[in-house]
Structures are given as structure tokens and as C-alpha cells.
Amino acid sequence: MTYKMKKEYAFWATVCLLLSLVPEFLNALSEEADDTDSELGSMKPLHTFCAMKADDGPCKAMIRSYFFNMYTHQCEEFIYGGCEGNENRFDTLEECKKTCIPGYEKTAVKAASGAERPDFCFLEEDPGLCRGYMKRYLYNNQTKQCERFVYGGCLGNRNNFETLDECKKICENPVHSPSPVNEVQMSDYVTDGNTVTDRSTVNNIVVPQSPKVPRRRDYRGRPWCLQPADSGLCKASERRFYYNSATGKCHRFNYTGCGGNNNNFTTRRRCLRSCKTGLIKNKSKGVVKIQRRKAPFVKVVYESIN
């Protein structure tokens, strides 16, 4: 009996001790919450998922993405692995701001007349080191226009835009946008390889013009076929083929095994099948002499009238 009373007394003593500690525990939680609120600031994001931490996921890709940082109240860049993760992940900085920052108003960044473009607009096309296939846009300083290119999925440079509209707003000057030019098609010419003749002026006479120099816009195929041969970054030596848009042929080169670009084929046949179809090519092998069509001969018969 005495043992049972002692056990009961110990139980109630423990309960009383725990109850006495509850107020202190609640005060500690309140102080911690106050510290967290002061650290995060008074701004609340528009959506609860904006408060999640950046999650790159379990995969190993390197995709530039953006997340909202609750501590800095800003959208920041991070590298996404390519799978899983959470909803606090955006493809563009502007999308992140519009989704998570209260009161953010979209401001169209336009290059005013005479205004300087950002330095990264003048960077060369850089598809990066990965072998993905992502449609992106870059500003071409030679044509003064935004053009489509294929991004590999990692690294590269800042002259890389998700949409054509975004590229134009940041890098393209609307005042100096070139007016459409009537491009001369190869079908308007006949050639023997050295002499180019205007088809419209041919009338039993071949009028020589200056030779037509191959230009980049004469190619209408896959964009990676215009990339130069890139042997990559590793130390292997594998026989590969790349398409030369200037000659219209596939040439052999040594590939080191990693990196490089998409203008990389295991066989010459695959190279030609993938890239040759985009070349605007003149199929005639000699000077075509065009004669004016003569009127049909009509025989007139005169009969005497008696």
C-alpha cells in the first residue's frame, strides 16, 4: 500500500512540475515568433509557396531559375536540377516578381532612341556546355535584331532570353529597327559556279554579275547547324562530323567526349540528313541560256479571185 502511494505521489509531482514549465515554454515560443517576424519583416508574399526555400531537386541538370527569398524580400537566382523541387521556382525574374512581390508593377524596359543597351546584349551566341534543346532568343548585334537560337540548358551568358518580346524590350532599339528588305532568292539567278546571271535580263545574252557570296540567311534549316565545330572540354578523341554552312558539306573533326555543341554527329550521313535540307541551293550546273519565245509561224495562202 505504501509503495502504491509513493508511486502516485511521484506521478502528481511530475505533473505539477510540467505544468509549472508550460508558461515559460509558451513565452519562449512567443519570443521566437517575434524574432522571426522581425527578421522576415512586415511584407507578406502574395502566395504561401513564395515562403518556401529554394529547392533544386534531386536531378543533376543545371537550369537557371528564380525563387522568392523571404529574408531579403527579393527574387534571386538559383540552379534547378530539372525535376521535383517546389512551387517557389520561376523561369524568369519578372515572373517571380509578379507572382510573389505585392504591389509589383510590370515595367517594360525599352531602349529609347540613342540610349545605350546593356553590355550583355553584345555578347556572342553561347549555347552552354549541356546537350539540352531549349528554344531561346538572343540579340544579334550585326543584324540589330533578336533571333532564335538553341540553348543547351546550362551556363552560357546573359544574352539569353525566354521570349522574343523580352529580348526586344531589353536589347532591340525600335527606332532603328531595319525595314523589311526584299531578299533576292537563289531561284532568280542561274550560275555556272563562277558567274551569276540575273534571270530577268537574259535574252540570248548572258550578263555577268558579281559572284553571290554565301550568307548566313541563305540557310533555313536547324539553327545548331550554323554553329562552328566544337571539340569540347575532355581528353578523348572520337571521330565526329559537323556541318559547314559556308560549304554546304559535312566535315570530320575530333570530339573530346564532353561539352561542345549540337553541331556534332556520329556519321556523315546523319549530319547531311539533319542539316543539308536547310540550304537554299541552286541545282543548275551550267549557264542556262533563256531565249525569248517566238510567235508561232502562220502560213498565209492567197487565192486568186476570178
From Swiss-Prot:
Q: Which UniProt keywords apply?
A: Blood coagulation, Disulfide bond, Glycoprotein, Hemostasis, Protease inhibitor, Repeat, Secreted, Serine protease inhibitor, Signal
**SUPFAM superfamilies per record:** BPTI-like
Q: Which CDD domains match?
A: Kunitz_TFPI1_1-like, Kunitz_TFPI1_2-like, Kunitz_TFPI1_TFPI2_3-like
Extract the Gene3D superfamilies matched here: Pancreatic trypsin inhibitor Kunitz domain (4.10.410.10)
Any single biological process term in GO: negative regulation of blood coagulation
Expressed in which tissues = Isoform alpha is expressed in heart and spleen; isoform beta in heart and lung.
Q: Which InterPro entries match?
A: Kunitz_BPTI, Kunitz_BPTI_sf, Prtase_inh_Kunz-CS, TFPI-like, TFPI/VKTCI-like
Q: Which residues form the BPTI/Kunitz inhibitor domain?
A: 50-100, 121-171, 225-275
Main location per UniProt? secreted
UniProt signal peptide:
1-28
Positions bearing carbohydrate: 141, 254, 264, 282
Site (described: Reactive bond): 60-61, 131-132, 235-236
What Pfam families does the record point to? Kunitz_BPTI
| GO MF annotation: an example | serine-type endopeptidase inhibitor activity
PANTHER family linked: BOOPHILIN-H2 (PTHR10083:SF217), KUNITZ-TYPE PROTEASE INHIBITOR-RELATED (PTHR10083)
Question: What's this protein's function?
Answer: Inhibits factor X (X(a)) directly and, in a Xa-dependent way, inhibits VIIa/tissue factor activity, presumably by forming a quaternary Xa/LACI/VIIa/TF complex. It possesses an antithrombotic action and also the ability to associate with lipoproteins in plasma.
Supply the name of the protein.
Tissue factor pathway inhibitor
- Which organism does this sequence originate in? Mus musculus
